[in-house]
Amino acid sequence: MTVAAQLNAICDEQPFVTRFMVRNLLTGEEIGRGENVETPSGSTRKTSIMMAVLKAATEGRIDLDQPVTYEKRLAEEVASGMFRYMTPGIVISLRDAVTGMMVLSDNVCTKMVLERVTLEEVDGYCKSLGMANTHHRFLIPPLALAADHPLKTVTTTSAADQVLLLQTILDAQSSKLAQEKLGCSAEACAWALQTLKNQVLRYGIRSRLPFEAVVASKSGRGKRGRMDAGIVYKNAAPFFIITTYTDDVAQTMADGTPGYTMALETIGKLSQVCWSGFQS
């Protein structure tokens, strides 16, 4: 059974929609399923926010060392991260706010960041990179958002758009052309990749890989599903890129299992097949 057949079989097992794109970085082989379909981004959107901030810093328009104060208002409508449980008045750098947004998906930190670059700027940045199906629409999705919300009520992306972004970040580790495309210095591109590697959350892509496997990724969750997008390494070298988006996931499956559990398990299985199949 081919890798592509195995990946599609995993998706076919579930009643919800799974869209993905994988790229074997050893051979260039690509496998996709609905990879160009616009889908809720969840927090995978934050990788492009990070890169837009780094571009602004490279251009001297913002200072990553500027102090940012945690104010109580920033915790309103926030359902992720740890800052919302902490005492207002804490001061961190903008760089640390970007780090918190990425490695813990802290939406207090996301608000801090998006008060220094605009959604319009981030959205335009994505379009300039060729991310045609990525649309940044809101700072933070409202907590009361319905599970069957329309696409236009959230930020959206596609599996292919996220592969494009991750590949460009990876290329920028050595390619001046990729650095220029991102609008970021070599140092900023190196920092971005390391920040993706510092991801704390280990479900999704990482869940069925060897514990020591290095993954540079950003996961996400939304009312309609779970998602994860990352670069998987083997023996310290880039191995494959995988971006996966589940959609129309029920709150509870027919057997009583929470829908998000099966969504994350599906992402883990897809990653595991790539890890095993691309090695043979």
Listing of model-derived features with the role each one plays in the protein:
Residues 2-8, 30, 169-202, 218-280:
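Structured C-terminal helix/loop/strand segments within mature extracytoplasmic catalytic/sensor domains
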Residues 65-71, 190-194:
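Beta-strand segments within the central parallel beta-sheet cores of soluble alpha/beta enzyme folds
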Residues 1-40:
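Beta-lactamase-like hydrolase cores
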Residues 75-113, 119, 151:
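Conserved catalytic neighborhood of penicillin-recognizing serine enzymes
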Residues 51-59, 164-171, 272-276:
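Short glycine/serine- and small hydrophobic-enriched flexible loop segments
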Residues 40-68, 242:
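Active-site SXXK
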Residues 14-17, 112-171:
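Mid-domain, small-residue-enriched loop/turn segments at the edges of structured enzyme/sensor domains
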